[in-house]
Amino acid sequence: MKAVIQRVKRASVKVNGELISQISKGLLILLGIGKNDEEEDIKILADKIVDLRIFSDENGKMNLNINDINGSALVVSQFTLFADCRRGKRPDFTNAADKEKALDYYKKFVEYLKSKIGDVKEGVFQAYMEVELINDGPVTIILDTEELKKPRRRKE
């Protein structure tokens, strides 16, 4: 699983011009599910996102997580995070999960995240969406469970 996490002042999703979801201060999470992802990746990724201290404390230091600020999350499915652009001029998406697996894992990710964060909103799976956001910082972090599962490197 891959996620692009953006700290936002606000974010919203529209489908066909109709407002579907919106949040104020919190995180916009663009979520990609790969064909080799496993169910354990859901918890690994969600727990990492919840625990990331990327919000500023009273001294301006990134020291608070999303729950510390009573923030919201907006989750938007995005299979294009698994684009392979090594060859040709058109991205190859064969590393993305098929739609059945992707929908299943997406729903499970959202439900698990709801158990960890008070306010979680969603986009519409497989829909063409207009995503609007006001970045805060900007702070943008890319997470990949393939990397998160590797052992930490030792400092030498």
Curated annotation (Swiss-Prot):
Pfam families according to UniProt: Tyr_Deacylase
GO biological process, one term: D-amino acid catabolic process
Transmembrane segments: none
EC number(s) reported in the record: 3.1.1.96
Entry's free-text remark on domains: A Gly-cisPro motif from one monomer fits into the active site of the other monomer to allow specific chiral rejection of L-amino acids.
Function as written in the Swiss-Prot or TrEMBL entry: An aminoacyl-tRNA editing enzyme that deacylates mischarged D-aminoacyl-tRNAs. Also deacylates mischarged glycyl-tRNA(Ala), protecting cells against glycine mischarging by AlaRS. Acts via tRNA-based rather than protein-based catalysis; rejects L-amino acids rather than detecting D-amino acids in the active site. By recycling D-aminoacyl-tRNA to D-amino acids and free tRNA molecules, this enzyme counteracts the toxicity associated with the formation of D-aminoacyl-tRNA entities in vivo and helps enforce protein L-homochirality.
Similarity annotation: Belongs to the DTD family.
Protein name from the UniProt record: D-aminoacyl-tRNA deacylase
Organism of provenance: Dictyoglomus thermophilum (strain ATCC 35947 / DSM 3960 / H-6-12)
The encoding gene: dtd
